[in-house]
């Protein structure tokens, strides 16, 4: 097993962990309907980039 040679200081420990956080998923607004959805996903009404791509129950 690997064993550290010297103790890592709190500053170095913090620098090591500086990228271990989560980001909120970016949201997009559908231009034709104004709905909010995840980027690169279709909106709840079946629109993607202003075009109807999936039939929904309401259609």
UniProtKB/Swiss-Prot annotation:
GO terms for cellular component: large ribosomal subunit. This is Large ribosomal subunit protein bL32. It holds the Pfam family Ribosomal_L32p. InterPro entries: Ribosomal_bL32, Ribosomal_bL32_bact, Ribosomal_zn-bd. Residues 1-25 are annotated as: Disordered. GO terms for molecular function: structural constituent of ribosome. It comes from the Bacteria. Keywords: Ribonucleoprotein, Ribosomal protein. Belongs to the bacterial ribosomal protein bL32 family. GO terms for biological process: translation.
């Amino acid at each position: 097993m690997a064993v550290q040679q010297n103790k890592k200081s709190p500053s170095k420990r913090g620098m090591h962990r500086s990228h271990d956080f989560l980001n909120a998923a970016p949201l997009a607004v559908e231009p034709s309907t104004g709905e909010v959805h995840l980027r690169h996903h279709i909106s709840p009404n079946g629109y993607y980039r202003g075009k109807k791509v999936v039939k929904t129950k309401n259609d």
